[in-house]
Design a protein with these regions (language model features):
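Short boundary/loop segments of OB/S1/cold-shock single-stranded nucleic-acid-binding domains
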Residues: 20-35
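Bacterial N-terminal signal peptides
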Residues: 7-19
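Conserved hydrophobic positions within beta-strands
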Residues: 37-41
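Short, structured beta-strand/loop micro-motifs enriched in basic residues and often containing a Trp
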Residues: 71-79
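Short aromatic-glycine-enriched beta-strand elements
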Residues: 47-58
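Positively charged n-region of N-terminal signal peptides that target proteins for export
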Residues: 1-5
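Short nucleic-acid-contacting surface segments enriched for D/E, G, S/T with interspersed K/R
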Residues: 78-95
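OB-fold/S1-family single-stranded nucleic acid-binding modules
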Residues: 100-124
């Protein structure tokens, strides 16, 4: 019985670590295709494990697309000068990043430029 418990514990630890490791990868994004979007912020989610920036941007035909941009965690962004009040509803920004390979309106943040020209750069996800 003790051996079974030990085998179960080791197996669970291995599976948990594999799931945690795969979650923090950036493989869902096309890192070879950098895009730049002029955006209007709709929501800024300062949450763990990742901060999300929700925004509207115009497509080439002039239609509004609703996007979600993933960044790193709040602790790491804080070290780069970000706060939970860095972005607000309606702020006009330029967002540079890598789109989802799936084609959905989701991207990984590389850089954000505020309306006054100030760049905000998170530490990159590897």
């Amino acid at each position: 019985m003790r051996l079974r418990c030990m085998i179960f514990a080791v197996t669970a630890a291995i599976l948990f670590n594999a799931a945690a490791f795969s979650h923090h990868g950036a493989s869902a994004y096309d890192r070879s295709n950098r895009i730049t979007l002029k955006a209007s912020i709709t929501e800024f989610k300062w949450t763990n494990p990742h901060v999300y920036i929700l925004f509207d941007a115009l497509d080439p035909k002039g239609n509004t697309d609703h996007w979600s941009c993933e960044s790193i965690n709040p602790g790491m962004l804080s070290k780069q000068g970000w706060t939970r009040r860095t972005l607000n509803f309606g702020d006009k920004v330029t967002i540079i990043g890598f789109p989802a390979k799936s084609g959905s309106k989701v991207m990984l943040l590389e850089k954000l430029i505020l309306a006054d020209g100030k760049p905000l750069v998170p530490a990159l996800l590897d």
